Regions:
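Compositionally biased amphipathic helical and low-complexity segments enriched in hydrophobic
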Residues: 4-12, 16, 40, 88-91, ...
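Intrinsically disordered, low-complexity segments enriched in small/polar residues
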Residues: 12-14, 20, 174, 283, ...
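Conserved DEDDh/DEDDy metal-dependent 3′-5′ exonuclease domain
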Residues: 29-39, 46-53, 57-194
Length: 404
């Protein structure tokens, strides 16, 4: 009898919750958390020609490595939230994500491309709205700013760094995840119009082509500038070796290496290596070393082995002409700034300020590499071509930049 009396209010509460679930999102939201559902989704999306994409991942924040947690897709009709941790693999998505005929809309997509590549998928047909927006006359430098500028939409980004690996995402996370993709399509339409107006469509296409070949960022341990400044070569070698030890310990625990042993702890071990106190010293550093004897013993053995490293051999000194060397030229910062100011004015005569500003990105570094004799530039060819067109038009001699 009690249960019968409770049914009406429970039913009312359930219907109310369902009706009020995501009123901010004007599209249905579908969860994909099985391999079968992912395969079905891939078949369903086989005929779309425009797909908005975003990802949420953990890059050494809570776990070891680059861990893809959530993929958000929007096909113009519905939002699909793919729980990566619940799936055995993402291979069912390859035909869609790697199909160049399907335009994939992203915003600031370099890391999204990398995290897909880590998972065995190389996206094709990408369209990054961040550079495209600036090359289309919009001034905002963030997605939230662009949404406000173009669509008049306010976007709360506070959930961006929340824990996306939780078994159940909270309501705010779900709304945030959906918002990250549903506005990319109307933004794309506005940006295309701006690109046509300023004749920058080819520039945008080149930016997108460069994005597709971006490589996964290095994650291996590296010395920091303070290590090079404050420690001798032997100590630097010891610090780097201990960083590799720490990396291995982080893999065992599936935790970011700096959670296990901080840079300060490593520096302390190296600075006081003659008085290294072993397991007791490690237990004072981190709770991870107080959890189990086997892990503590392994860490102690590996650290002691690392501290036995001898001095590294002397650096090889090559004869002057043994290796190709960059020319050592000193450029005048004042003259570089004068040149950039003139180039900006030249671009402003052809484009609006936001386009001109974007086209000037990277010019300083390019100039220094060019004047040093480098021939492998990390600088988009279309921007290089525009700059040299200006130099030819103005008759400017780059040798004027060299300090007398």
């Amino acid at each position: 009898m009690y249960l019968l009396l409770m049914l009406p209010p429970l039913l009312f509460w359930y219907l109310y919750q369902m009706s009020m679930r995501y009123p901010e999102i004007p599209y249905p939201i579908h969860w994909i958390d099985t391999n079968e559902a992912l395969l079905e989704l891939s078949n369903q999306l086989a005929f779309v020609r425009l797909l908005a994409i975003d990802t949420e991942f953990d890059r050494f924040r809570r776990k070891y490595g680059i861990n893809l947690e959530l993929i958000q897709l929007f096909d113009g009709e519905a939002v699909y939230l793919i729980r990566v941790g619940a799936l055995s693999n993402l291979l069912s998505l390859k035909p869609i994500i790697e199909n160049p005929a399907v335009i994939k809309l992203l915003y600031s997509g370099s890391e999204d491309i990398q995290v897909f590549k880590v998972n065995g998928i190389a996206p094709k047909g990408v369209y990054d709205l961040q550079p495209a927006s600036q090359l289309s006359g919009f001034s905002a430098m963030s997605l939230a700013g662009l949404l406000q500028e173009v669509l008049g939409v306010s976007f709360d980004k506070s959930k961006q760094t929340s824990d996306w690996s939780k078994p159940q995402l909270d309501r705010e996370q779900i709304v945030y995840a959906a918002n990250d993709v549903i506005y990319l399509v109307p933004l794309y339409n506005q940006i295309k119009e701006g690109a046509a107006r300023f004749c920058t469509t080819d520039f945008i296409n080149e930016e997108n082509a460069l994005l597709e070949v971006v490589e996964v960022s290095e994650t291996k341990p590296r010395l920091k500038q303070r290590h090079r400044e404050n420690f001798n070569r032997h100590e630097q070698a010891l610090i780097l070796e201990l960083m590799h030890v720490r990396d291995g310990l982080g893999q065992i625990l599936n935790k970011p290496p700096h959670f296990v042993l901080s840079d300060g702890h490593i520096e302390d071990i190296v600075s006081r290596r003659d008085n290294y106190a072993g397991t007791e010293q490690l237990k004072a550093y981190s709770a991870f070393f107080r959890r189990g004897y086997d892990f503590l013993s392994k860490a102690d053995r590996d650290i002691r082995a690392a501290l036995t490293m001898p001095w590294p051999p002397p650096k090889t000194v090559h004869a002057r002409n043994d290796l190709p060397r960059l020319q050592k030229v000193v450029l005048s910062n004042e003259k570089i700034e004068d040149l950039l100011q003139s180039y900006t004015l030249y671009l402003n005569e052809q484009y609006v300020e936001s386009v001109a500003t974007y086209l000037c990105n990277g010019i300083r570094r390019y100039l220094r590499e060019l004047m040093a004799g480098a021939d492998d530039f990390n600088f988009p060819p279309y921007r290089r071509k525009l700059f040299h067109q200006y130099l030819n038009t103005s008759g400017f001699d780059l040798n004027q930049l060299v300090e007398a």
